[in-house]
Design a protein with these regions (language model features):
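Conserved class I S-adenosyl-L-methionine
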Residues: 2-58, 71
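Class I SAM-dependent methyltransferase SAM/SAH-binding core
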Residues: 63-65, 69-116
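A short acidic, Gly/Pro-enriched loop at the edge of an enzyme's catalytic core
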Residues: 115-126
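A short SAM/SAH-binding and catalytic strip from SAM-dependent methyltransferases
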Residues: 126-139
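A short glycine-rich, Lys/Arg-flanked "PGG" loop and its adjoining helix->strand segment in the class I
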Residues: 140-152
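C-terminal alpha-helical "lid/dimerization" subdomain adjacent to the S-adenosyl-L-methionine
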Residues: 161-233
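C-terminal lobe and adjacent flexible extensions of AdoMet/dcAdoMet transferase-like proteins
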Residues: 241-247
């Protein structure tokens, strides 16, 4: 039993390091995507979406989980919020700090595992994340942690997708394979291999997220499909979505 548990921990640790290594290699290209978004229509879209999700709250304390090069971090700081941002990848944090300086905002960045937060309970008014949970070995534990650090009445906003669900449902197939942008010579094969092995490749979302968040005691859970494909038979494939949950 002890040997099995140790083997599982070692496997998970190895996978986590593989994930970190890949995103370290992608940091420079990924920051190009983030800057394009911050200077384009995506910024306007997310400002509106976040404002609506907060329902008029001003200057809240925010945790950006898996911040990458800092798209949400910079955006929320420019909106006047107090932002703490974490990422497990050193190079992503380096790019995020550069972007915060470039756009003239103050953000508190820390290196941290999204599945094991180092903050006190009830610390934040808003926990926000984008394209992170699919990338985790223990997504349910991550949700528990994100909810733990939310204040009572706080809001969780998670933007994600069924990126590797084609592993489970062949209908998704090539229709939903992730389009990698600004690769800058980095091969996507490692993250595709990892993504296909992770738990979220076997769960249809946001239905799975709704169940988990309700089980965690969320007082309100809503989801909005932001990208989908309609098949000839009338069946709908959910590609991307945004989940809003209230603690």
């Amino acid at each position: 039993m002890i040997s099995t548990e140790r083997s599982e921990r070692e496997t998970m640790s190895h996978t986590l390091e593989e994930i970190r290594s890949y995103w370290n290699s992608r940091a420079e290209g990924y920051t190009q995507s983030n800057r394009e978004e911050l200077e384009g229509e995506s910024r306007i879209y997310w400002e509106k979406h976040i404002t609506e999700a907060l329902r008029g709250q001003d200057c809240v304390r925010v945790l950006d989980v898996g911040c990458g090069p800092g798209f949400f971090s910079v955006l929320l700081a420019k909106m006047g919020h107090e932002v703490t941002a974490i990422d497990y990848t050193e190079n992503m944090l380096t790019e995020a700090r550069k972007n915060a300086e470039h756009y003239g905002v103050q953000v508190h960045f820390q290196q941290m595992d999204a599945q094991q937060l180092e903050f006190e309970d009830n610390s934040f008014d808003l926990v926000i994340s984008r394209n992170v949970l699919w990338n985790l070995e223990k997504p349910e534990q991550a949700y528990k942690e994100w909810f733990r650090v939310l204040k009572p009445g706080g809001i969780l906003l998670n933007c994600d997708g069924n990126f590797y669900y084609y592993v489970t449902d062949a209908e998704y197939g090539d229709r939903t394979r992730w389009e990698h942008k600004h690769m800058n010579g980095v091969c996507a094969n490692p993250i595709d291999r990892i993504g296909e092995s992770l738990p979220m490749a076997r769960e249809l979302r946001p239905q799975w997220d709704d169940r988990i968040l309700c089980a965690l005691g969320a007082s309100e859970v809503t989801s909005e499909v932001t990208n989908e494909k309609d098949l000839d038979d009338g069946h709908r494939l959910i590609l991307n979505f945004v989940i809003r949950a209230v603690k």
